Structure formats: structure tokens, C-alpha cells
Amino acid sequence: MGMSAAQSHPNIITTTADWLFSWARRSSLWWLQFGLACCAIEMISSAMPRFDLAERFGMLYRASPRQADLMIVAGTVTKKMAPVVRQLYDQMADPKWVISMGSCANVGGPFDTYAVVQGVDQVIPVDIYVPGCPPVPEALYYGVLELQNRIIRYERLKERYGPEAAEAYREEERQAARSALGPRS
């Protein structure tokens, strides 16, 4: 016979393994920094003692994409760099998440030239867009919090309706975020 929740010890929490893994996945993101321009300086400053993004959110920097589940692309992505971004994204383990940080990564910034990709979402799927030129660390905080909320919704949908429904939700969220950026040249 099993114990009911009322009979169990008050310091013992009963839950499913899936819920525990989902909580750990959103509360302990391992991120791959991909800093390409001035936005990378703000990303680095967000990890310093004043803001301490990594410690506050339980995030760890990873040098290898195989160990990361979050990629933060900060700065201008050139057409020569685009295959490298795609290769690093493909090497990440599933589920993988992407934050596009700054105007250059979001829409190409002021560089409307033949050599610049007009938004990293033309190379890899992006989950969160952090605006600014360069964005302040607080904006990156907000982006990480939004990503954690999306991970919670994704995991709930995956548990309740299956992985296809969760992926459809993710794609709808990406389309909505892309359309909020407005038309591109």
C-alpha cells in the first residue's frame, strides 16, 4: 500500500520524474555564447557580479554546443558566418532554444548590405528576440525569464498533448515573434 499525501512527512515532496526534469531544464539552462559584435559586451557584462545572470538563474556557460541547450546570438551575423551558426545549432542537444540579442541579430541592424544576414532567424529558428542597440542586461534578463515561461508551457503541452502539439506551439510562438519585428527590406 502506498502513502497518501496527507499521511506523508511534510518535508517530502511527491512528484513525477517528468515534472522534475522539466523544472530542472528550465531552471538550469546551459548556454552557448555566440557574441559577434557590441551586443556581446553587454552579454558579458550581464554575467559580471553587478548583474550576475548566471548565478541568479542557475545558468552555466558552455564552450561546447553539445553540452548547451540555449544559444544566445548577440551581434551581426554575416553570410560567411551563417553556416557556422547553423552548424553550432545543429550540434546542440534537443530541446534547444535560441535567444536573438540586439538589433543586428534580430533584423540585421543598420547594415543592409550584401554581406549581412537580415536577422539570424533566416539561418536558425529563434525563440526570443531581445531588442536594443545594444540591449541592456535587464533586457536580457527579461528575455531569459520569457524563455523560462515558454519552456514551462512547452513542457506542459508536451506532457498533456504530445510532442507534436508542443512543437506546433513553439512554431506558432516563433511566427508571432517574427511578425512583431515588422517587415524587412
Swiss-Prot record:
Alphabetized UniProt keyword annotations: 4Fe-4S, Cell membrane, Iron, Iron-sulfur, Membrane, Metal-binding, NAD, Quinone, Translocase, Transport, Ubiquinone
Protein location: Cell membrane
InterPro entries: NADH_UbQ_OxRdtase-like_20kDa, NADH_UQ_OxRdtase_20Kd_su
Enzyme Commission numbers on file: 7.1.1.-
Residues noted as binding [4Fe-4S] cluster in the record, renumbered to the chain: 38-39, 104, 133
Cofactor remark: Binds 1 [4Fe-4S] cluster.
Domain of life where this protein originates: Bacteria
Cofactor names: [4Fe-4S] cluster
Biased composition regions of type Basic and acidic residues, renumbered to the chain: 165-176
One Gene Ontology CC term in the entry: respiratory chain complex I
Catalytic activity from the UniProt record: a quinone + NADH + 5 H(+)(in) = a quinol + NAD(+) + 4 H(+)(out)
Main subcellular localisation: membrane
Pfam family name, one: Oxidored_q6
Disulfide bonds: none
SUPFAM superfamilies: HydA/Nqo6-like
Keyword Cell membrane attached: yes
GO molecular function: 4 iron, 4 sulfur cluster binding; iron ion binding; NADH dehydrogenase (ubiquinone) activity; NADH:ubiquinone reductase (non-electrogenic) activity; quinone binding
Protein's UniProt keywords contain Protease: no
Region (Disordered) location: 165-185
Membrane topology of this protein: Peripheral membrane protein
Family in the record: Belongs to the complex I 20 kDa subunit family.
Matching NCBIfam families: nuoB_fam, PRK06411.1
Function summary: NDH-1 shuttles electrons from NADH, via FMN and iron-sulfur (Fe-S) centers, to quinones in the respiratory chain. The immediate electron acceptor for the enzyme in this species is believed to be ubiquinone. Couples the redox reaction to proton translocation (for every two electrons transferred, four hydrogen ions are translocated across the cytoplasmic membrane), and thus conserves the redox energy in a proton gradient.
Protein name per its UniProtKB record: NADH-quinone oxidoreductase subunit B
